[in-house]
């Protein structure tokens, strides 16, 4: 049986630890110190490092972790798994769409999805974890009620990436890398003020944050109901985009206008 736990980092990052009570894989360790504290507090050995994309707040802790944990519990070189299309320090396994990642300790398997948009080579890791169920670790592509900025990709690429993630089973838990949900919900409410599922989710988000709890993971099923970036083809979203002066001439244009609105939303 596995557990997935957040390791807070920086101001609003989540490094994800997947562990079996003995060994842990960490996803997107932007800094090392919080990971080292977590491992020590839980009595865990580091078994693998998994990276979704090249930004420093996702891989900045890799070198320090490799210095502290050069090998796994059985003496093998520490695996560092990351996207083939990006520069990842210390990477031992380059992955792309269709690849399978298999780890011995903790015992788990992921299939790799190419999800360009936020960065050109961004990947996500989807799997079915014993004791957890279906999951996707999606970095900065899909957020709870939002999506990542388009730093390197196009609206068409990001839309296709989000469509790919939205096609996962509804019960899939979405482990994104930032606690942006409150601000994302504010924007979503501006886009779809009549969305009752979103109103319910807003109340839940406020309750969680007031209690100091993460709003992540969400689920793919919930995101389909409340996330404007998964709903950019909905008439309500299209009308809101048009009211802001955005083009809805095509799917990519409408998505790009929606993303541009969010970029400037206050």
Curated annotation (Swiss-Prot):
Cofactor(s) listed: Zn(2+)
Record keywords: Hydrolase, Metal-binding, Zinc
GO biological process: methylglyoxal catabolic process to D-lactate via S-lactoyl-glutathione
Cofactor note: Binds 2 Zn(2+) ions per subunit.
Catalytic activity: an S-(2-hydroxyacyl)glutathione + H2O = a 2-hydroxy carboxylate + glutathione + H(+)
GO molecular function, one term: metal ion binding
One Pfam family cited in the UniProt record for this chain: Lactamase_B
Pathway: Secondary metabolite metabolism; methylglyoxal degradation; (R)-lactate from methylglyoxal: step 2/2
UniProt: Zn(2+) 1 binding residues: 53, 55, 118, 140
Protein residues bound to Zn(2+) 2: 57-58, 140, 178
Domain of life, per lineage: Bacteria
Key word Calcium present: no
EC number: 3.1.2.6
Protein family (similarity comment): Belongs to the metallo-beta-lactamase superfamily. Glyoxalase II family.
Function: Thiolesterase that catalyzes the hydrolysis of S-D-lactoyl-glutathione to form glutathione and D-lactic acid.
Oligomeric form and interacting partners: Monomer.
This protein's name: Hydroxyacylglutathione hydrolase
Organism of provenance: Cupriavidus pinatubonensis (strain JMP 134 / LMG 1197)
């Amino acid at each position: 049986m596995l557990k997935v736990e957040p390791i807070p980092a920086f101001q609003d990052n989540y490094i994800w630890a997947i562990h079996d009570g003995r060994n842990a894989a960490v996803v997107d360790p932007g800094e090392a110190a919080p990971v080292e504290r977590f491992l020590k507090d839980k009595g865990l050995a580091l078994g693998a490092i998994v990276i979704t994309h090249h930004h420093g707040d996702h891989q900045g802790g890799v070198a320090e972790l490799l210095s502290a944990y050069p090998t796994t519990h059985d003496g093998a070189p520490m695996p560092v798994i990351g996207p083939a299309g990006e520069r990842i320090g210390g990477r031992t396994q380059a992955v792309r769409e269709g690849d399978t990642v298999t780890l011995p300790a903790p015992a788990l398997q992921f299939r790799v999805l190419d999800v360009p948009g936020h960065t050109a080579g961004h990947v996500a890791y989807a799997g079915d974890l014993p004791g957890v169920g279906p999951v996707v670790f999606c970095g900065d592509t899909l957020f709870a009620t939002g999506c990542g900025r388009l730093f390197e990709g196009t609206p068409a690429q990001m839309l296709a990436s989000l469509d790919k993630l939205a096609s996962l089973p509804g019960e899939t838990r979405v482990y994104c890398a930032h606690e942006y949900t409150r601000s994302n919900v504010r924007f979503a409410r501006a886009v779809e003020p009549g969305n009752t599922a979103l109103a319910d989710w807003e109340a839940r988000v406020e309750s969680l944050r007031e209690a100091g709890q993460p709003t992540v993971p969400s689920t793919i099923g919930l995101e389909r109901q409340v996330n404007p970036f998964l709903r950019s083809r909905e008439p309500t979203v299209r009308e809101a985009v048009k009211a802001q002066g955005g083009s809805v001439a095509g799917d990519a244009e409408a998505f790009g206008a929606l993303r541009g609105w969010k970029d400037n939303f206050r």
